[in-house]
Amino acid sequence: MSTKPLEEPGILETDSTLVRLMNERDLETVVAIDAVASGRRRPRYFQLMLERAVKQAALQVSLVAEVEGRVAGFVIASLYYGEYGVSEPTASLDAIGVHKANRGRHVGKALLRQLRLNLSALRVTTLRTEVSWDDFDLLAFFKKEGFTPAHRLCLDCALDPTRFE
């Protein structure tokens, strides 16, 4: 992954977006934003992710963005210190979403900018994520934000939950 430098100080296109730590009150809005993008509601998934993020409050890296006082987007990330045979601290971007009314208003960019700042302060050297190979809009967004293909291969193994041997 390339290390994209932060913009020079001054007026940024993300300045109208307030980015803050995610909290329990954000759950329903996060679920609703994700449901529009994914086509399904995943309240339990986000409840578990939010509970984990709040419990790790000292290392909170999950954020929401507000535009005009309303939650307009979110990013959920996790920290890893040596898992999967990687010696340096890394982070995983687990989920990101922007309300459809706020797309094109640099909300996602503001979220990633703040996430990068937070992770850099924690001395995290790499941010990783996974994207469906046919989600071209998200792939284009991540490319624009400096993500490149990783030198790792994600593997799947189909399991049969009805088979007990």
Give, region by region, the residue ranges found by the protein language model:
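Terminal substrate-recognition subdomain of acyl/acetyltransferases
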Residues: M1-L12, E130, K143-E165
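Acetyl-CoA-dependent GNAT
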Residues: L12-E13, T17, L21-R25, A32-E88, ...
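Loop/helix-junction capping segments adjacent to catalytic residues or to phosphate/diphosphate-binding pockets
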Residues: R40, R105, F136
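Residues at secondary-structure transition points
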Residues: Y84-E88, H106, W133
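Conserved acetyl-CoA-binding loop-helix of GNAT-fold acetyltransferases
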Residues: V98, G104-L117, K144
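Conserved active-site alpha-helix within GNAT-family acetyltransferase domains
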Residues: K109, A121, W133-H151
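Conserved GNAT acetyl-CoA-binding A-motif
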Residues: L119-V131
